[in-house]
Amino acid sequence: MAVLTDEQVDAALPDLNGWERADGALRRSVKFSAFLDGIDAVRRVAEHAEAKDHHPDIDIRWRTVTFALVTHSEGGITDKDVQMARDIDGILG
């Protein structure tokens, strides 16, 4: 699978809710109303990621969860990451 160019990633961003290209990955931070709401969201995303065998890096800081997507085996952002970002958008609503 080919790594996307910066231009290709930038072209995909308008269709993604709150995602940005930063530090070589697609990133989205979400603030939840309560800590356990964030944990539940992480669980739902993790179940989907496991089924797809494509796992985001996840950082939990109290009520804020940050998802980062990069295809490590390819060394950059690929179509799999863009699709997973769309999937996460759907899971989080």
Swiss-Prot record:
Has the keyword rRNA-binding been applied to this entry? no
Q: So what EC number does this one have?
A: 4.2.1.96
Report the catalytic activity: (4aS,6R)-4a-hydroxy-L-erythro-5,6,7,8-tetrahydrobiopterin = (6R)-L-erythro-6,7-dihydrobiopterin + H2O
> Carries keyword Lyase?
yes
Which first-to-last residue range defines the signal peptide?
A: none
Q: Which SUPFAM superfamilies match?
A: PCD-like
Provide the GO biological process annotations.
tetrahydrobiopterin biosynthetic process
Q: Which UniProt keywords apply?
A: Lyase
Q: Which domain of life is it from?
A: Bacteria
One Pfam family assigned to this protein is Pterin_4a
Q: What's a Gene Ontology MF term here?
A: 4-alpha-hydroxytetrahydrobiopterin dehydratase activity
> Per the similarity annotation, which family is this?
Belongs to the pterin-4-alpha-carbinolamine dehydratase family.
Quote the protein name from its UniProt record: Putative pterin-4-alpha-carbinolamine dehydratase
Q: Which organism is it from?
A: Mycolicibacterium vanbaalenii (strain DSM 7251 / JCM 13017 / BCRC 16820 / KCTC 9966 / NRRL B-24157 / PYR-1)
